[in-house]
Amino acid sequence: MNQALRVSVRFFTTLREVTGKKEENLEFPKGETVTVSNVLKRLAENYGKGFTEYVYDIKTGEVKGFLQFLVNGRSISSFNGLDTKLEDGDVLAIIPPVGGG
């Protein structure tokens, strides 16, 4: 039986509104290299324009710099950024900026 690699994604504030969820569980084929970038692309496919426009700069196609990403509670900046590889059971949190002023 072919097992899947499972990753949980947690959404906060605006992304909860965009997705209508607090959490999404994604499955990828076992053996596939899964990165934060791959997960974002899958989420963009699943949630469409609202998610895509919130996460990506439409002009450059790059992920917007104001978003923070944590893998199992640690910032991806301490790993390999968007190329950080994810393992089965990892939790990716996507955290928009907290408003203030």
Predicted segments with their positions:
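Ubiquitin-like/PB1-type beta-grasp interaction modules and other compact soluble beta-rich domains
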Residues: 1-100
